[in-house]
Amino acid sequence: MAMSVHCDIVSAEEELFSGLVEMVIAHGHLGDLGILPGHTPLLTDLKPGPVRVIKQGGTEEVFYISGGFLEVQPSMVKVLADTAVRAGDLDEAAAIEARKAAEKALSEKGTEFDYGSAAARLAEAAAQLRTIEEMRKKFGGRSR
């Protein structure tokens, strides 16, 4: 049996996952992170995108986070997300529409234009679509 570490994935609204995992994979601001049991203690911020957990036995579950923090301690990994959902619960049509609306806002700058807000909405929609695409590649279109 492979070694495992306890993992919690929580958002401001709820705890989405709590259990033993063999590995956690997330997108940090300096690149991808792969956390295995025995990893050195770490605290880092996370970019919007997928967080993958490989559970005991090798099954994998994918979550989308809108950003947050990753804390690693000797016996646990904790993902503290601003917003988090199971990747299978993402609405692809809504993410595409949000991306189009943000792109339109960026191209039609008006007097009340907030570039930072429009860019953040575009980045979040793009991260959701990347998560959906990664899940499709990994699971062949099946939701997990």
Swiss-Prot record:
Domain of life, source organism: Bacteria
PANTHER family: ATP SYNTHASE DELTA/EPSILON CHAIN (PTHR13822), ATP SYNTHASE EPSILON CHAIN, CHLOROPLASTIC (PTHR13822:SF10)
Membrane topology label: Peripheral membrane protein
Molecular function per GO: ATP binding; proton-transporting ATP synthase activity, rotational mechanism
GO cellular component terms, A-Z: plasma membrane; proton-transporting ATP synthase complex
Family statement: Belongs to the ATPase epsilon chain family.
rRNA-binding among keywords: no
Subcellular location(s) per record: Cell inner membrane
Taxonomic classification: Bacteria, Pseudomonadati, Pseudomonadota, Gammaproteobacteria, Pseudomonadales
Annotated protein name in UniProt: ATP synthase epsilon chain
Keywords: ATP synthesis, Cell inner membrane, Cell membrane, CF(1), Hydrogen ion transport, Ion transport, Membrane, Transport
Entry-linked Pfam families: ATP-synt_DE (PF00401), ATP-synt_DE_N (PF02823)
Self-association state and partner proteins as the record states: F-type ATPases have 2 components, CF(1) - the catalytic core - and CF(0) - the membrane proton channel. CF(1) has five subunits: alpha(3), beta(3), gamma(1), delta(1), epsilon(1). CF(0) has three main subunits: a, b and c.
UniProt cross-references to SUPFAM superfamilies, sorted A to Z: Epsilon subunit of F1F0-ATP synthase C-terminal domain, Epsilon subunit of F1F0-ATP synthase N-terminal domain
Function comment: Produces ATP from ADP in the presence of a proton gradient across the membrane.
